[in-house]
C-alpha cells in the first residue's frame, strides 16, 4: 500500500515496485489521478495487479472505512509506504498561518498514524510486514521559516523509532527514508502555486528526483529478512545539510 500515490515520490515508487512484480494498493485524494495511474501501470506492467482507494489521510473515519472495505484477497498488506505528506508556507512562527500548520500536522503526523493504525493489526497477526515512513532532512534539522514542517518530520522520526520498539516482537521492519531536496510538486504546494518561486528552490544545482527516492525505498524493501535499514538519509551531491546547497550558475 502506497499513500499519496498520485504524484512525486509516491508515483515513482508505484512504477518501481510494479516493475518488480509487486501487487499495489494505490491511495490518494484525487480519484481521477488514481484511476489514470492504475490504468497506466496496468498497461505497462501486466504481471502486477492494482487496486485504488480514494481517501484523505486526514479523515480518520475515511481511512478506516477504506481499508476495512478491501476485498479479502487484498487484506494481507505486507508493505505499507507512508508517503503522503506536505509542507505549506515558509513564514516565521509569528507570521505563519495556523490553517497551514493544521494541514501539515493533520497530514504528516495524524494521517500517518491513522493509516498505520488501520494496517498494522494485520501485520501483527501474521507476524510479518515492513513499514516505510517518508521522513526528511527536516526531521533531523530545523531551518528558518520551517518550524512547523520540521516539527512534523521530527515527529515522523520519533514515531518510526517507537514503531520499531512496539512491533519488534512481531518481526515487522520499520524503515525511515529521509530525503534532502527532491524536485517534485513539493515546492509548488509549499508556495501555494507560485511556480517561479518553486523553481528557484532547484535552480543552479541538480536535486534528487522522485525516482532516486523510489529506488532507495526498493533498496530498503529488498534487504534480507534479518536486515532492517532503519534510517536512510539521501541527499543531492550538491547539498550538505538543510541550509547548505552549492549552486553553480549556468553560463
PLM features: residue spans?
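Conserved glycine-rich Rossmann-like NAD(P)H-binding loop of the short-chain dehydrogenase/reductase
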Residues: 22-37
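C-terminal helical subdomain
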Residues: 176-180, 184, 196-243
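Conserved glycine-rich cofactor-binding loop
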Residues: 6-8
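Active-site helix of classical SDR
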Residues: 116, 152
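Residue(s) in the substrate-gating loop at a strand-loop-helix junction
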Residues: 136
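The beta1-alpha1 cofactor-binding region of Rossmann-like NAD(H)/NADP(H)-dependent oxidoreductases
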Residues: 32, 54-65, 98
Amino acid at each position: 500500500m502506497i499513500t499519496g500515490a498520485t504524484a512525486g515520490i509516491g508515483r515513482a515508487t508505484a512504477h518501481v515496485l510494479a516493475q518488480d512484480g509487486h501487487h499495489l494498493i494505490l491511495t490518494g485524494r484525487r480519484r481521477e489521478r488514481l484511476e489514470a495511474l492504475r490504468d497506466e501501470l496496468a498497461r505497462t506492467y501486466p504481471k502486477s495487479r492494482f487496486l485504488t482507494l480514494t481517501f484523505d489521510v486526514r479523515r480518520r473515519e475515511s481511512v478506516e472505512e477504506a481499508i476495512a472495505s478491501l476485498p479479502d484477497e487484498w487484506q494481507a498488506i505486507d508493505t505499507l509506504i507512508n508517503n503522503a505528506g506536505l509542507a505549506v508556507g515558509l513564514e516565521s512562527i509569528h507570521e505563519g498561518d495556523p490553517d497551514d500548520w493544521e494541514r501539515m500536522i493533520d497530514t504528516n503526523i495524524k494521517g500517518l498514524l491513522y493509516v498505520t493504525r488501520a494496517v498494522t493489526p494485520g501485520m501483527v497477526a501474521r507476524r510479518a510486514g515492513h513499514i516505510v515512513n517518508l521522513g526528511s532532512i527536516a526531521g533531523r534539522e530545523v531551518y528558518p521559516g520551517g518550524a512547523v514542517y520540521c516539527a512534523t518530520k521530527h515527529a515522523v522520526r520519533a514515531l518510526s523509532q517507537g514503531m520499531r520498539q512496539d512491533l519488534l516482537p512481531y518481526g515487522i521492519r520499520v524503515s525511515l527514508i529521509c530525503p534532502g531536496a527532491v524536485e517534485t510538486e513539493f515546492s509548488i504546494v509549499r508556495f501555494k502555486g507560485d511556480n517561479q518561486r518553486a523553481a528557484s528552490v532547484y535552480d543552479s544545482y541538480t536535486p534528487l528526483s522522485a525516482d532516486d527516492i523510489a529506488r532507495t525505498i526498493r533498496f530498503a524493501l529488498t534487504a534480507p529478512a534479518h536486515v532492517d535499514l532503519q534510517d536512510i538519509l539521501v541527499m543531492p551531491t550538491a547539498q550538505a545539510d538543510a541550509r547548505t546547497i552549492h549552486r553553480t550558475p549556468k553560463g
